[in-house]
Regions:
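Membrane-interface helix-boundary motifs at transmembrane edges
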Residues: 58-71, 97, 127-135
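Early transmembrane alpha-helices of polytopic membrane proteins
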Residues: 1-58, 71-85, 91-94, 103-124, ...
Length: 194
C-alpha cells in the first residue's frame, strides 16, 4: 500500500529513493492524501493483527497460565497503542503539527518495541506446547535489535538537533531530506519492526 506513495514521491523527487524519510512522503500534496489514507489502512490492519494474535494466545492458553493471560492482555494494549500512534502520524503531517506528529511516531515505534518484546516473551513462555524455540529466538533477536535501533534513532536525532541549535540558535531544525542527510537508524528501526 505504502509502496504506491513511495513510488509517487520518488517520481516527483520529494524523497530520496534509497533511504526515504517516511514523513517526507506525507507532507506534500497529493502524496499527503495517499500517505494518510494508506497509513490509516495499515494502522487499522495492525490493530486487527494485534487483536487476532491476542485472541490466538488467549485461546491456546485458556486458563492454564494466569501470568501469561495477564501479560497477553497488557501486550494487547501496547500493540493497540502503537497502532494508535500510527493513526496520529498519518493524520497530523510533520509540517502542520510537529508535536503531535512526533508524539505519534514515538508512540508508534516505542509501543511497537514494547509489543515486540512482549511477543518474544510470550513465545518463550508458550514453548514447547504452542511455540517453537526457533521462532521465539528469532522474535527475541528482532525485538532487541528494534529496541536498540529505536534508542539510537531517538538519541542521534536529539543530539543532532541540539548540536544544530547550539550553532544556529535562531534557525528551525532542518528537515533531513532537504539537506540530503540519511536517517539510517530510523530506517533500520522501521524495517526491523515489520
Amino acid at each position: 500500500m505504502l509502496g504506491f506513495t513511495y513510488s509517487f514521491s520518488v517520481w516527483r523527487g520529494d524523497v530520496d529513493p534509497v533511504f526515504p524519510y517516511i514523513s517526507a512522503a506525507g507532507d506534500n500534496r497529493p502524496e499527503a492524501c495517499m500517505f494518510s489514507m494508506f497509513l490509516n489502512i495499515c494502522s487499522f490492519l495492525s490493530m486487527l493483527i494485534v487483536y487476532l494474535r491476542y485472541s490466538l494466545v488467549a485461546e491456546l492458553n485458556r486458563s492454564s497460565d494466569l501470568l501469561l493471560k495477564s501479560f497477553n492482555r497488557l501486550n494487547l494494549y501496547a500493540g493497540l497503542l502503537g497502532a494508535s500512534g500510527m493513526f496520529l502520524v498519518a493524520n497530523f503531517q510533520e509540517t502542520a503539527v510537529i508535536q503531535v506528529h512526533l508524539f505519534g511516531a514515538f508512540l508508534c515505534f516505542g509501543s511497537g518495541c514494547v509489543y515486540m518484546l512482549g511477543q518474544a516473551w510470550i513465545s518463550y513462555r508458550m514453548y514447547p506446547l504452542f511455540s517453537g524455540i526457533r521462532i521465539a529466538k528469532i522474535r527475541g533477536v528482532m525485538a532487541i535489535a528494534s529496541v536498540c535501533l529505536f534508542f539510537m534513532a531517538f538519541g542521534f536525532g536529539w543530539a543532532a538537533a541540539n548540536t544544530f541549535h547550539s550553532v544556529f540558535p535562531d534557525l528551525p531544525t532542518p528537515r533531513p531530506w532537504t539537506h540530503k542527510l540519511v536517517p539510517m537508524p530510523a530506517t533500520i528501526c522501521t524495517v526491523s519492526q515489520r
